[in-house]
Amino acid sequence: MLDESLLDAPEALARADRRDLLRGAAEAGARVRTAARHAAEAGIGGLNPEGRPRAVLVAGPGTAASGVADLIGALAGAAAPVTRIHPTGVAPAPGALHWTLPGWAGSVDLLLIATADGSEPGLALLAEQAYRRGCTVVAVAPTRSPLREAVDGVHGLVVPMAAAPHGEYDAETSAAGPGTLWALLTPLLALLDRVGLVTAPAEELQKVADR
C-alpha cells in the first residue's frame, strides 16, 4: 500500500521509493507513445514479412531485457518459441558481457535485442554473428549508442529507445523501472504484430498508453 502522505513529502518519497518505480510508472504512458512513434518512423509499420519466424531469440542486459523476453513469450504463446539468450561474464561490467547464438539459429529465425544502455560490445558482436547466419536482427537501443552505430543499416534495424519525458534520472535504477520496460517492449510488439506473432496494432498500443 502507498502511504499517500509521501506524495507531499518529496524527500521521504525518495527514501521510500529508492528505485524510482513510482515516477517510472507515471511516465510509462508517455514512453509507450514515443516508442510507438519511433517504431513507425523506423518503418516497422511498412514491413511486409513473407511469413512468421521459426523462433524468436531475445538478448539484452538486466531485468528489463528479461522482462521483455518473458512478456513476448507469454504473448506469443504457441505461435513461435521465444528464447532468451543469457549473457556470460561479469554483470556490472557491460563490456565483459557476451551473448552467443544457439547452434541451430539461422535464416528463418528472428533476433531481438533490447538494451537501455547500448554500449555493450557483446551485443554488437551478437548482431554480427546473427547477420552472418542469416537471422533477421531488430534492436531497440538509445539513439546515441555504439550499438546503434554498429548495427543500424549494417547488420539489422535499430529503433531508437524512447527516453524518459523529463530526461534520464539515475541510470542504475531507471534501467529496471516500468518506463524502461515499456520503452524497450513497445517497438518490438509493433514488429511482432507485423510478423503475425502477437496482436498489437497501433491503436491498441495507444490504448495501453492511455491507461
What are these regions (language model features)?
Residues 51-210:
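Glycine-rich phosphate-binding loops that contact phosphosugars or nucleotide phosphates
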Residues 13, 44, 205-208:
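Generic structural signal of hydrophobic/aromatic residues within well-ordered alpha-helices
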